[in-house]
Amino acid sequence: EKVQLAAGLDENKNLTEAAQQRGLACLARFVGRLSAVQPNRLRIVATNALRQAKNGHEFIQKAAEILPKPIEIIAGREEARLIYLGVSHTMENSGRRLVIDIGGGSTELIIGEEFEPIHTESLQMGCVAYTKAFFAEGEINHKSFDKAVFAARKELSTIANTYKNAGWDTVVGSSGTIKACRQITVNMGWSNAQENLTREGLEKLKDKDRKS
């Protein structure tokens, strides 16, 4: 369920009451599914939004009244590791893979083989954070787009050499943002429903956005 806690971070990095209530309501709807899980097999974690939120402890205290176990705020690389494990258990072994997960406040990139992550990284670039930083008015233009690309390249430059040297055979996107991009390329006729998201499709999407 889409909650987008990161969208509820105000200018002081505090979660707004509305964002907290969205998150708590989601947890209340979800908690019933946890009743069949043994407590010793259950781990409840929070990621970037609560890592960033100065008042994250308030949300965790409220959530403790709903959940069977306390929330653990995990580091970015641990988030990346867990993402990789989740993806690897849903796919056939296909050599070395790069897994990309674009979240609301951060993006995780992991290179691994089978069930073993080799390189894990979490970068401060997410779809909600970039929307607020570069497209706050809901408009995409050349200037704002180029600023967003520059910021993303700056983040990626910190890991580019390591990841290029490690190499990969396939790329897997695990986030809603990537799924949305693929669906748009299908709807626009730039790829068919059986194809993966391609660089060609992304380039066409980029060009159309910049012309809008």
Specify the residue positions occupied by each region the protein language model found.
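Helical "lid/coupling" subdomains associated with nucleotide-phosphate turnover
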Residues: 3-39, 44-96, 111-211
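A generic, well-ordered mixed alpha/beta core segment in the N-terminal half of proteins
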Residues: 96-106, 110
